[in-house]
């Protein structure tokens, strides 16, 4: 995943690669989207912002159909693997992500064959994501087999980067005696791109005619890992509260279900806009009073929603609709930037929304704290410095071994 893809992993990998290209020779092997965001065909090879990019053969079948998604994963991973066997050299540091899920395994083989060091960034922990989203049955042979494979993977790589404490625990259990290779490095907030905007000046709220409403927003992926059903159940219970509007912005497997429910239940307090381009983030993330960020209970440790950091940058309080043990909920509670509610209890969410609406002064204080975190603890400078230290560790270790 890499530019011009706009998904979170592609964005973060692009920014990291371009940063390290200032100090090292950086090359990227990735899938090949047909067009960029402006409809311009994407070249197979290019040198962009200091990075050599080679886009491999890819399949673009509908990823919402599971069989097609598997085919896409296989084609993309095989293509990158074959290129990696040629492009990777002895002594290289290779950085790989967990999407698609097969990619880390084929990259590990390529690195072992070519004598390179491998750094694994975990965005999603498998097979836990598959179990939580209902793709695999817990306790099934396939789940146990995938757990075994991932244990081998985690013990074969030289560093593991995880996005939160819950993920570190889960990955640590699989890494076993190699758990000392794990480093917690969260995603960053784009505080220079996303910044607070007065509600009455927000163009999206003006366009929708809801500047005078208390707006509860959920932006991002509307997929199997999100407790969208709980959010809709809460919205239905608040249907008679005419001053509260729910604004959904995003895409994913549950979009058709959402549209159907809005029609069937006449949920006039819900506005669904679909996906918006990343460059419009500042407008749409500021189009609310409070932001909902959600994960299913089984997703604790299996993923951390990157959207939360730019919600902070927009100075918006968060209602975490997720397990209390998730990184999302831990940050929300520890930093006092919002509320934590159960992803299985719409009544709890209703109560929290009404509490938030009744104390706008507290909302403002939470928003200020969230923005400060985005500018400091979760700034791009702070997070990239963590990657720099981790890479320096690897280089020092390698030099030490050479001198023995």
Q: For the regions a protein language model found, what residue spans apply to each?
A:
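N-terminal subdomain of nucleotide-sugar transferases
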Residues: 1-49, 399, 403-404
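Carbohydrate-associated surface elements
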Residues: 32, 166, 188
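A short helix/loop element that forms part of the nucleotide-sugar donor recognition site in Leloir-type
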Residues: 41-46, 195-209
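Conserved donor-binding/catalytic core segment of Leloir-type glycosyltransferases
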Residues: 210-226, 232-235, 247
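A short, well-ordered alpha-helix in the C-terminal region of glycosyltransferases
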Residues: 213, 348, 355, 362-376, ...
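Nucleotide-sugar-dependent
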Residues: 226, 277-284, 291-312, 317-330
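Nucleotide-activated donor-binding/catalytic signature segment of Leloir-type glycosyltransferases, i.e.
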Residues: 239, 243, 249-250, 255-282
């Amino acid at each position: 995943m890499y530019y011009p893809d706009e998904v979170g992993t592609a964005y973060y990998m692009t920014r990291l690669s371009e940063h390290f290209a200032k100090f090292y020779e950086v090359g990227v092997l990735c899938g090949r989207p047909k067009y960029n965001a402006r409809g311009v065909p994407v070249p197979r090879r290019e040198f962009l912002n200091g990075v050599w990019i080679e886009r491999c053969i890819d399949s673009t079948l509908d990823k919402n159909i599971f069989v097609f998604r598997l085919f896409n994963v296989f084609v993309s991973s095989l293509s990158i693997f074959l290129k990696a066997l040629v492009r990777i050299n002895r002594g290289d540091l290779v950085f790989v992500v967990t999407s698609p899920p097969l990619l880390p395994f084929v990259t590990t083989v390529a690195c072992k064959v070519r004598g390179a060091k491998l750094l694994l960034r975990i965005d999603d922990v498998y097979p836990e994501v598959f179990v939580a989203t209902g793709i695999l049955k817990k306790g099934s042979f396939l789940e146990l087999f995938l757990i075994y494979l991932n244990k081998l993977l985690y013990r074969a790589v030289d560093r593991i980067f995880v996005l939160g404490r819950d993920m570190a625990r889960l990955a640590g259990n699989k890494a076993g005696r190699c758990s000392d290779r794990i480093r917690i490095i969260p995603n960053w907030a784009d505080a220079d791109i996303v910044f607070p905007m007065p509600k009455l000046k927000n163009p999206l709220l003006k366009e929708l005619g809801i500047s005078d409403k208390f707006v509860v927003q959920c932006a991002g992926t509307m997929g199997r890992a999100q407790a969208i059903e709980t959010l809709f159940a809460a919205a239905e219970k608040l249907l008679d509260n005419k001053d509260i509007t729910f604004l959904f912005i995003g895409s994913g497997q549950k979009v058709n279900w959402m549209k159907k429910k809005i029609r069937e239940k006449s949920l006039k307090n819900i506005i669904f806009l679909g996906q918006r381009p990343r460059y419009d983030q500042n407008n749409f993330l500021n189009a609310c009073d409070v932001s909902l960020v959600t994960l299913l209970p089984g997703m604790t440790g299996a993923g951390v929603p990157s959207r939360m950091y730019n919600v902070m940058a927009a100075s918006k309080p968060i209602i975490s609709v997720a397990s209390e043990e998730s990184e999302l909920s831990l940050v929300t509670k520890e930093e006092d930037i919002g509320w934590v509610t159960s992803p299985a209890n719409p009544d709890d969410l209703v109560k929290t929304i009404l509490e938030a609406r009744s104390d706008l002064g507290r909302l403002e204080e939470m928003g200020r704290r969230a923005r400060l975190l985005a500018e400091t603890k979760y700034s791009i400078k702070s997070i990239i410095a963590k990657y720099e230290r981790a890479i320096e560790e690897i280089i020092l270790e390698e030099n030490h071994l050479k001198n023995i």
